[in-house]
Amino acid sequence: MAEEAYEYLVPLEKYLSAGVRLGTRLSNRYLEERGFIFAVRPDGLRIFDIKKIDERLKIAAKFIARYPPDRVLVHTTRPYGFKPVQMFCKFVGCRALTGRFIPGTLTNPNLPHYQEVDLLFVVDPKLDAQAVTEAAKMGIPVVALVDTDTPHQYIDLMVPCNNKGRKSLALIFWILARQILRERGELKPDQDLPVPPEEFETRLVQ
C-alpha cells in the first residue's frame, strides 16, 4: 500500500521562497539529535527539514489555541518580528510586546508594566532571553521559534525555522494565525485569512 502523501499547511514552494528552512552556520546538537536539521550546505549553512517545521507549526497552533488569547503574550525584540507579531495578535487576540522587555514584566506585580499571563511566545530565545528566564521563574510555559543555533533551555515547545528573515517571519506568523483560528473554529478548515502573508511582512525603508 502506497504511503499517503503528506499535506503541508502551505505549498512547499511558499516555504522555499520565504527562506523558512535556512538556518545559520552554527548548530545546536539538541536540534540535530531530534532530526530538525536536514542538511549542511557546502558553505556551512544548516538547512531545516521543512516537513518538521510544518509538523511543529500544527502542534504549536493546537497548543496555543488551548489558551485564552488575552492570556498569551507574544514578544520579540527583533525589528523584523514587530509587524508579524502585531498582525498575528490582531487576528488571534493575543497580547503583543515588541521592542525592549523591561525586567520584572512577568515577575514583579508592583511594577506598572507587569503582565500576568498563562503562556509566553517568543521569536528568538537568544534575543528574548530576559522574557524566557522570567517565564521559567514563574512557571509559565514558553513557545519559541528556534534557529539552528538557538539554546533550548526553558523552551517547552520549539518551532524550528529561520527566525531572523523578514519573509520567513511573515509566513510563519501568517500560518500560525490562520491555523489557530481554524483550531478554534473561527475559520473553516479550508479557509484563509482575509490578508496574504505579505501583509505580515515588515517593510524596508528606502
UniProtKB/Swiss-Prot annotation:
Single GO MF descriptor: structural constituent of ribosome
Annotated CDD domains: RPS2
Entry keyword set: Ribonucleoprotein, Ribosomal protein
GO biological process: translation
GO CC annotations, alphabetized: small ribosomal subunit
InterPro entries linked: Ribosomal_uS2, Ribosomal_uS2_arc, Ribosomal_uS2_euk/arc, Ribosomal_uS2_flav_dom_sf
Gene3D superfamilies attached to this UniProt entry: Glucose-6-phosphate isomerase like protein, domain 1
UniProt xrefs under Pfam families: Ribosomal_S2
Similarity comment: Belongs to the universal ribosomal protein uS2 family.
PANTHER family recorded: 40S RIBOSOMAL PROTEIN SA
NCBIfam families in the record: uS2_euk_arch (TIGR01012)
Protein name per the record: Small ribosomal subunit protein uS2
Organism: Pyrobaculum neutrophilum (strain DSM 2338 / JCM 9278 / NBRC 100436 / V24Sta) (Thermoproteus neutrophilus)
Phylogenetic lineage: Archaea, Thermoproteota, Thermoprotei, Thermoproteales, Thermoproteaceae
